[in-house]
Every structure is written in structure tokens, then in C-alpha cells.
Curated annotation (Swiss-Prot):
Converts acetolactate into acetoin. It is an enzyme of class 4 (lyase). Pathway: Polyol metabolism; (R,R)-butane-2,3-diol biosynthesis; (R,R)-butane-2,3-diol from pyruvate: step 2/3. GO terms for biological process: acetoin biosynthetic process. The keyword Lyase applies. Belongs to the alpha-acetolactate decarboxylase family. It catalyses: (2S)-2-acetolactate + H(+) = (R)-acetoin + CO2. It comes from Vibrio cholerae serotype O1 (strain ATCC 39315 / El Tor Inaba N16961). Keywords: Acetoin biosynthesis, Decarboxylase, Lyase. Gene3D superfamilies: Hypothetical protein, similar to alpha- acetolactate decarboxylase, domain 2 (3.30.1330.80). It holds the Pfam family AAL_decarboxy. GO terms for molecular function: acetolactate decarboxylase activity. Its EC number is 4.1.1.5. The lineage of its organism: Bacteria, Pseudomonadati, Pseudomonadota, Gammaproteobacteria, Vibrionales. This is Alpha-acetolactate decarboxylase.
Length: 261
């Protein structure tokens, strides 16, 4: 751990200023991704990559499961399935995913959160800590949350509907006064269609009994870790669904924003 990248200060503004001038950023590590976000938007909901195979490429990440059967969150080599009924359960090694993003998590920026912050404020803090949008950031937050709002897509059946139709019927859950973990990524804007540009985060409670794709949250206290990553490896499927999908629709950015908000 570089001593310049470890902070123990009660003021997030001062911490951000401390790192803002730290410009010689050279993200380490590698992000492994199976399939493309544009494929998921197009309705490619089945993949051949297993959870066991994902863990060969990382110990931290997020994604979904075949047939859109819930959200995926992973940290410390633990992988959980966040179901559409709001529950959470450990994922099985043989389960498969149509889309997932994994990395071996290595934090090079760490700091405590000692004041109440909204999701937007946390994102602004991260943007000041890592001012270049051309790097990937793996983000982990362990904390106490007065509120977290999540959604989880319900399991689908063939013939598959496009993602924008599916999310119209997704259940929304509100967790109050919970300890838990946020795992997510900030991806560069140039990855639109490949990944989710900007912030993409999932949440699970400390009891590992509930969670989902984050729409909003408020954190009271916690610990933020950021790992900067400069390499991306994408493993594209060879299924008929993928090969025949329109992966470059005109509205791809708008579609991703609508599906992932």
C-alpha cells in the first residue's frame, strides 16, 4: 500500500483535496468481463460462463444470472444471488451468467466515511479522488446505511423480452438502518455498450439475507476502498442469440441509462 494512498481523516473534503493533485495514476490489475452490456439490453439472457470460472478471473464483481434470475454480487471470493423477492443466497459454482464483471480487488485508495453522505456525494468524492474518467475503478464500501433502495430483475422465460421491457416490472426494495456491503465499478464513458458507463453498484446486507441493484442510498458511516484498473478483457459468447443480436442500436446509451438507473 502506497502511504500516499491511505488516509485516516474525518473530513472527506480534505481527503479529496489531498488526492486531487496525485496525478501519476497508473491503474493496476485487470477487469474480466463476460459478454457485453449491449447484448444484455438486446435480450441475450443466457451464457455459458459459470460462477466457478468467474472466480478464476477475480474475487470481486457483479453481474446477473442466466434468464436474468436475480443480481450477482461478489467480494472476498463469496458470490451471492440477489433474488427478485428481495432475498439473498450463496451462488452455486455451476450456475451460469450471461453478463458479469470481475476483478481481483486491490485497493490503492482507502478512507473512512465519518459523515452522512448521499450516493451522489459519495460519487463526487470518488470522482475527486480519481479525476480521470479514462480508468476503471473497482469500489467497495462497508458501512451503515440509513436507507438503501434497490431493484432486482425477475427471472425471464423464452421468448425473451428486451431489457427495457423487463425493467418496467422489476420490484423495488427499501432497506432501512442496515449494515452492509456495496460492490461496484465506475467505468469510463468510452465503454458505453461494452459495459455500464459511470457507476454500477450492488448491495447486500450484513446478514447476507437481502440486497439488489442499487438505485439510491444514504450512508452514515463506513469505509471506502477504491482500486484503479487500466486493463479490460472481454470474453464474448458464440451462442446464436449473441451472434444474431443487434449490439449497436442507435439508442444504446439511453437504453443502458434507463435499464441501470
Amino acid at each position: 500500500m502506497n502511504p500516499l494512498l491511505s488516509a485516516h481523516c474525518s473530513c472527506s473534503q480534505e481527503i479529496a483535496q489531498q488526492f486531487a493533485h496525485y496525478q501519476h495514476i497508473s491503474g493496476e490489475g485487470e477487469i474480466y468481463q463476460t459478454s457485453l452490456m449491449s447484448a444484455l439490453i438486446a435480450g441475450v439472457y443466457e451464457g455459458a460462463t459459470t460462477i466457478a470460472q468467474l472466480l478464476e478471473h477475480g474475487d470481486f464483481g457483479l453481474g446477473t444470472f442466466n434468464e436474468l434470475d436475480g443480481e450477482l454480487i461478489a467480494f472476498d471470493r463469496q458470490v451471492f444471488q440477489l433474488r427478485a423477492d428481495g432475498s439473498a443466497q450463496p451462488a452455486h459454482p455451476e450456475q451460469q451468467t450471461p453478463f458479469a464483471v470481475f476483478t481481483f480487488f486491490k485497493a490503492d485508495i482507502e478512507l473512512p466515511i465519518t459523515e452522512r453522505m448521499t450516493r451522489e456525494q459519495v460519487h463526487q468524492l470518488i470522482d475527486r479522488l480519481v479525476p480521470s474518467d479514462n480508468l476503471f475503478c473497482a469500489i467497495r464500501i462497508d458501512g451503515t446505511f440509513p436507507s438503501v433502495q434497490t431493484r432486482t430483475v425477475p427471472k425471464q422465460q423464452r421468448p425473451y423480452r428486451p431489457m427495457l421491457e423487463v425493467v418496467k416490472q422489476q420490484p423495488v426494495f427499501r432497506f432501512q438502518q442496515q449494515h452492509g456491503v456495496i460492490a461496484g465499478f465506475r467505468s469510463p464513458q468510452y465503454t458505453t455498450g461494452i459495459n455500464v458507463p459511470g457507476y454500477h453498484e450492488h448491495f447486500i446486507t450484513q446478514q447476507r439475507t437481502g440486497g439488489g441493484h442499487i438505485q439510491d442510498y444514504i450512508i452514515r458511516s463506513g469505509f471506502l476502498q477504491i482500486g484503479r484498473v487500466s486493463r479490460l478483457v472481454v470474453d464474448t459468447p458464440v451462442s446464436r442469440d449473441f451472434l444474431e443480436a443487434n449490439l449497436t442500436p442507435n439508442n444504446i446509451r439511453t437504453a443502458i441509462e434507463a435499464a441501470e438507473k
